[in-house]
């Protein structure tokens, strides 16, 4: 993910409505919930493809739908199913972060493409692809999908768009970031400005609220 798309202009248009909402904890920003996921065709495409691609088809030497990549992932998830929730979160973060970072332009010939877990396991990927497979992994382990989001942010240090995964956990919001080895609290991050976040049912726009 190299830039914030024109969708940002749509999000900003809702600012007057969102500013009346109570403050949200994520990075100390307010948020405005929405249900129209049609604004996010790439995200909807990921959800649809993931359902189809979870079917164990294809050969182990296939270039695209390689069932062995899925088998390895599923084996990993089974191996940590007995662990406590916090350990599972750390293990999932580490598992995904071992994959090589590859720009969408190199993988798919376009500047921004949201890959399904199966595509990420085969092709590697960029920031949102790490976030997506982490979310799908934790969902499969039994975590509540309503507590997790893919969060698109502006990295004010590098001045680029970025994406991470967030999960509500024990009165905190934990951030799983491909740029950071450890799982950390959102309270300890000050260089990310959240733009929007999505899960399977809703999306949110984020607006400044001030931080303590």
Question: Which residues are covered by each model-predicted region?
Answer:
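N-terminal signal peptide c-region/cleavage motif recognized by signal peptidases
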Residues: 13-15
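Sec-dependent signal peptide recognition
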Residues: 2-9
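A structural boundary/capping signal
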Residues: 18-212
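Short, linear, compositionally biased motifs with a strong N-terminal bias
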Residues: 10-11, 142
